[in-house]
Swiss-Prot record:
CDD domains: TMPK
Superkingdom in the source lineage: Bacteria
EC number(s) reported in the record: 2.7.4.9
Protein purpose: Phosphorylation of dTMP to form dTDP in both de novo and salvage pathways of dTTP synthesis.
InterPro entries with a match to the protein in the record: P-loop_NTPase, Thymidylate_kin-like_dom, Thymidylate_kinase
One GO BP annotation of this record: dTDP biosynthetic process
Family, similarity comment: Belongs to the thymidylate kinase family.
Name listed for the protein in its UniProt record: Thymidylate kinase
NCBIfam families from the UniProt entry: DTMP_kinase (TIGR00041)
UniProt KW keywords: ATP-binding, Kinase, Nucleotide biosynthesis, Nucleotide-binding, Transferase
GO CC annotation, single: cytosol
Pfam families membership: Thymidylate_kin
One Gene Ontology MF term: dTMP kinase activity
Species for this entry: Desulforapulum autotrophicum (strain ATCC 43914 / DSM 3382 / VKM B-1955 / HRM2)
């Protein structure tokens, strides 16, 4: 089972990963938690380049191909072996992030992005993609608070420094994908409390994947809100 989590900056998706994995584990699903970019040794170096605000002059194509390189290594080293071993993979961002950040927001053609996906990812597709929908104003306010509280670091804040219009294009890009692939996407309202969002996630997984996760415990929730 392959589950991906997507959303704008500050949508709270990262906060939900640990309780989700704990819930899966309690129900007999051995889960591997991973993320993009930066899930491998090579990927961590690519992540540092991509998210460094000092790299504001990075070209859109450079950004696109760096994400593709990170994903190629990630698939080879983490995702494909885990799925092959029968494990559940829970991934914080995947191909949809490229489609909306580099496509809808940056303006790179869908044709080029699709070509890169076909080379790097081939026919692998998540069983379920959970989209944490949130307005950019609220999301960016959360990220500012996280930076102030030391829960995020300034050396990974390049995307947080983009304009509000950029983040709105990201949000609308995600919603367009969800509308086009309703069988794959589960859209959750990220404005709710962490407990409300978690409950919505688990009930959605049960409904969409035909499984029965039980034993939901609000104590699983990390009190911090991240993107």
């Amino acid at each position: 089972m392959f589950i991906t989590l997507e959303g704008i900056e500050g949508s709270g998706k990262t906060t939900q990963i640990k309780p989700l994995v704990d819930c899966l584990g309690q129900n007999g699903y051995e889960a591997v938690v991973t993320r993009e970019p930066g899930a491998t040794v090579i990927g961590k170096k690519i992540r540092a380049i991509l998210l460094d605000p000092g790299n504001s002059g990075m070209s859109d194509l450079c950004e696109l191909f760096l994400y593709g390189a990170d994903r190629a290594q990630h698939l080879s080293e983490v995702i494909i072996p885990a799925l092959g071993a029968g494990k559940t993979v829970v991934c914080d961002r995947f191909t949809d992030a490229t489609t909306v950040y580099q496509g809808a927001a940056r303006g790179i053609s869908k044709e080029l992005i699709d070509i890169i996906h076909s080379v790097v990812v081939k026919d692998l597709c998540p069983d379920l993609t959970i989209l944490f929908d949130l307005d950019p104003e609220t999301g960016l306010a959360r990220t500012v608070k996280a930076l102030t509280d030391g829960e995020r670091t300034l050396d990974e804040s390049r995307f947080e420094r983009e304009t509000l219009e950029f983040h709105e294009r990201v949000r609308q890009g995600y919603l367009a994908l969800a509308a086009a692939e309703q069988d794959r996407f589960l859209v959750v309202d990220a404005r709710g409390t962490q407990e409300q969002v978690f409950t919505e996630i688990v009930s959605g997984i049960n409904r969409r994947l035909g499984i029965d996760l039980v034993g939901i415990d609000s104590a699983m929730i990390d009190p911090r809100v991240k993107g």
